[in-house]
Amino acid sequence: MSTINEMWDDLTSSEQLVFKKCCRRLLKETFIVRDIDDDNRKMFFFVKSNEGLFSDYLNLIGFDIVVRDNGVVMLQNNSADVVVSKQRFNKFQSIILCCLWTLYMDKIQSGSLSKQITTTFPELNAELEKFEFKGAFDVKSNLKNALQLFARYNLIFVNWNASDNERVIVLYPSIQFALDESEFATFVIGVRERMMNAGPQSEDVAEDNFDAEEEEE
């Protein structure tokens, strides 16, 4: 079995640069999503072709990778170690993430064959209303910030330059790994209980379940 140094030496100088780029991208954004653009496509296939090297290298700093057949590379904490880093969302951001996750899964389970899964702001608002937290948050002022945060981690994309009538939210396959069904059910129950007991300005923090290495400012 080849060692990390042997696998590294087998790479060309240009491939070594791509390797470093992929590692930086995963540590910064958690996901590489093949279908975002050509740059991400190249990185996805490079990671897939060198999965052993990435796994061995990232294990040294407490991480591992998962390569999915649907075109997603995901960085995760090594289960054998303590949590290295965790992105934390406030309650409102966590609720939006759950709503987007639900919309994505509904569209997939309904048999959508579209290469790009999208949703609209009216669809998202309708899903948000199911949580019955009207008045608890200023939705308009916080929604854009939450969506921009999710875009940072390659979960979604929103073309903010489009007109209101044409603006859609692209849901990347990576969003399905931000929550699984059991975690989603547990989260919803907990949120509804807290929302019933919380005041209008409550900003409880809820943890998501994917890992993200924060950059130093």
Language model features by range: what are they?
Residues M1-S79:
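Eukaryotic partner-binding/assembly regions in large regulatory complexes
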Residues V33-K42, G111-E129:
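Short acidic, hydrophobic short linear motifs in intrinsically disordered regions
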Residues F46-F54, G135-R152:
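Short amphipathic alpha-helical interaction segments
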Residues S55-Q116:
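Short basic alpha-helical hairpin corresponding to helix-turn-helix/winged-helix-like nucleic-acid-binding
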Residues I61-V67, L147, A151-A162:
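A short, conserved structural fragment
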Residues N77-A80, N161-T186:
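Short, cationic-aromatic polyanion-contact patches
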Residues Q87-R88, P173-D208:
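Short, amphipathic alpha-helical interaction segments positioned at domain boundaries
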Residues T118, A126, K140, E193-E217:
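Exposed, interaction-prone assembly regions rather than primary DNA-binding/catalytic cores
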